[in-house]
Amino acid sequence: MWKASAGHAVSITQDDGGADDWETDPDFVNDVSEKEQRWGAKTVQGSGHQEHINIHKLRENVFQEHQTLKEKELETGPKASHGYGGKFGVEQDRMDRSAVGHEYQSKLSKHCSQVDSVRGFGGKFGVQMDRVDQSAVGFEYQGKTEKHASQKDYSSGFGGKYGVQADRVDKSAVGFDYQGKTEKHESQKDYSKGFGGKYGIDKDKVDKSAVGFEYQGKTEKHESQKDYVKGFGGKFGVQTDRQDKCALGWDHQEKLQLHESQKDYKTGFGGKFGVQSERQDSSAVGFDYKERLAKHESQQDYAKGFGGKYGVQKDRMDKNASTFEEVVQVPSAYQKTVPIEAVTSKTSNIRANFENLAKEREQEDRRKAEAERAQRMAKERQEQEEARRKLEEQARAKKQTPPASPSPQPIEDRPPSSPIYEDAAPFKAEPSYRGSEPEPEYSIEAAGIPEAGSQQGLTYTSEPVYETTEAPGHYQAEDDTYDGYESDLGITAIALYDYQAAGDDEISFDPDDIITNIEMIDDGWWRGVCKGRYGLFPANYVELRQ
C-alpha cells in the first residue's frame, strides 16, 4: 500500500480534543443590519431576497448588442451597391447581367388549360408527321435497358480477350509497358532556352516578341510636340509629292451651284430656240402639242371592233364575237333532262308516259296530214295531166278540120312533152311572208281547166285552144292553193327549246314543235297557237320557218 501513496502529500488531521465548533471568537463583532437579518445574511452566498430585474436596462443592453451586430454584418458581408450598377445605378460596368430593372415585363407562360397539347406530338390524332416532336417517342418505342456492370464483357476494347486482338485495342488505353514521363519541377526547368539560348548567343532561338536589355523604347511625342506640316504639301506647302490628295490649298475657290432661277433650262429641250433636235428631250413636248382628251363613254363609237359600222368591215371583225344570224341549232335528239328522283317516282313515270303518248299522237297526226297532202297533190296533178291531154286532143281535132273563118295565127308547134316540163317553172321556194299577202283568186274557167263535176256536155270554144300559153296560170293557181293552205296557218315557227307556261295567258311547247298563227306583238314576246292553245311565248325560243 505504500507504493500507492508514494509521491503524494499526506496531511493528517489532529484531534483538538473535542472542541466546540459553535464557539465564537472573542473579538467577533455582529455588524449585520436589521434588513440583512430579516432577508438573510450576506456572508452566505445565494441567501436572502433577490432584487427584481431592471427591464429598461435590459432593453437598452439588447438594443446596443443588436446595433453592434448589424454594423459588423454590413462591414463583413456583401455590399448591395456593387454588382447592381454601382452606387445610384449609374456604373454600367458593374451592372449585374442577371439583374433586371423595373421596366422588365416577364412573359408568363400559359396555364395547362390554355396550352394546346396536341401540337408537337404528331398533331391532332397523331397523324401530322411533320409536326412530330423529334425528342418524343410513340407507344411502339421499345427502350433497351443498358446492361448491368456485372453483365458487361470488359475483355473487348482493351485488346480483346487476353489482349491479343490489336485491332480492338482502345486508343485511349495504355498497357502495362507504358512508362509515363513525369514533368519536371519548376526548379528543374532551364528557362535559358527560348530567350536567345544559353547566355543569349543562340540567335536562331531568340523569342521574336522578347527584347534584350539593349532595347531602348522610344516614347511617342505629345500632341504639342508633333510637326503637322508633313502630309499637307510639306513644310511651307512646296513638297507637292507629299501633299494630301483630299486637302485643298488656299488658292482653291469653291464654285457654288447656281440657284434655280439662274440655271439655263433651254438645254435638253431642243437647245436654244428649240432647233437642236438631237438634244431634244424625247419625253418633252412643245407648245404646239395638243392633248386629245379621251371621249366619254357616251361619245365612243362601240361599233368598231365588232365588224365595224353596220357589221360590214370584215377586217375589223372580232374573232370571238358572233353575229345574230349564228344561231346554234339544237339537235333533234334532244331529250329533256329528268332528275334521278323523278325517274324513281311512279307519279313522274305516269306523267312521262302521258307526255310520250301526246308526242306520239302529235307525230302521227303530222304524218297523216303530210300523207293526205301528198295524196291530194298527186290526185290534183293527175287530174291536171288528164285535162291537159284532153285539151291537146281537142286541139289536134280542131287543127285537122279548120273552120271557114279567117286564117288564125300560126300556133307554135311544140312537142307534146313540153307542157309537162313547163310546169316546173312556177314551183319555186317562196318566202315565209307570202302568206301575209292577199291571195290571187284564179277561177278554174279562166285557166282553161273544167271542173270535175261539169266536164261532160261542156263545149269548148277555140279561144283556149289558141291561148295555150296561159296554161301555166293553172299551175300558178295550184301553188296559190297550197299557199292559201299555208296562209291559213299564218306565220309559223319551230321551237328550238322547251318552254313551260308561267301564266294562264302563255303556252307551253317542246323542241321541234310548230307554232302557227304567230302575231308579233313585241320584240321579245309573240302570240301564237300550239297544241290547241293560244297564248304568249318568248320569241328567242323559236325560229321562223322560211
UniProtKB/Swiss-Prot annotation:
Residues 1-28, 355-424 are annotated as: Disordered. Residues 17-28 have a biased composition (Acidic residues). One of its GO terms (molecular function) is proline-rich region binding. The modification Phosphoserine is found at residues 113, 150, 261, 405, 407, 417-418, 443. It is found in: Cytoplasm, Cytoskeleton; Cell projection, Lamellipodium; Cell projection, Ruffle; Cell projection, Dendrite. Residues 348-401 form a coiled coil. It holds the Pfam family HS1_rep. Acetylated. Phosphorylated by FER. Phosphorylated in response to FGR activation. Phosphorylation by SRC promotes MYLK binding. Phosphorylated on tyrosine residues in response to CHRM1 activation. Phosphorylated by PTK2/FAK1 in response to cell adhesion. Tyrosine phosphorylation in transformed cells may contribute to cellular growth regulation and transformation. Phosphorylated by PKN2 at both serine and threonine residues in a GTP-bound Rac1-dependent manner in hyaluronan-induced astrocytes and hence down-regulated CTTN ability to associate with filamentous actin. One of its GO terms (biological process) is neuron projection morphogenesis. The modification N6-acetyllysine is found at residues 87, 107, 124, 144, 152, 161, 171, 181, 193, 198, 235, 272, 295, 304, 309, 314, 346. The modification Phosphothreonine is found at residue 401. CDD domains: SH3_Cortactin. SUPFAM superfamilies: SH3-domain. Changing residue 482 to F: No effect on interaction with KCNA2, but decreases KCNA2 levels at the cell membrane. Contributes to the organization of the actin cytoskeleton and cell shape. Plays a role in the formation of lamellipodia and in cell migration. Plays a role in the regulation of neuron morphology, axon growth and formation of neuronal growth cones. Through its interaction with CTTNBP2, involved in the regulation of neuronal spine density. Plays a role in focal adhesion assembly and turnover. In complex with ABL1 and MYLK regulates cortical actin-based cytoskeletal rearrangement critical to sphingosine 1-phosphate (S1P)-mediated endothelial cell (EC) barrier enhancement. Part of a complex composed of NEDD9, AURKA and CTTN; within the complex NEDD9 acts as a scaffold protein and is required for complex formation. Interacts (via N-terminus) with NEDD9. Identified in a complex containing FGFR4, NCAM1, CDH2, PLCG1, FRS2, SRC, SHC1, GAP43 and CTTN. Forms a complex with ABL1 and MYLK. Interacts with SHANK2 and SHANK3 (via its SH3 domain). Interacts with PLXDC2 and SRCIN1. Interacts with SAMSN1 (via SH3 domain). Interacts (via SH3 domain) with ASAP1 (via Pro-rich region). Interacts (via SH3 domain) with DNM2. Interacts with ACTN1. Interacts with FER. This is Src substrate cortactin. It comes from Mus musculus (Mouse). The lineage of its organism: Eukaryota, Metazoa, Chordata, Craniata, Vertebrata. The gene is Cttn.
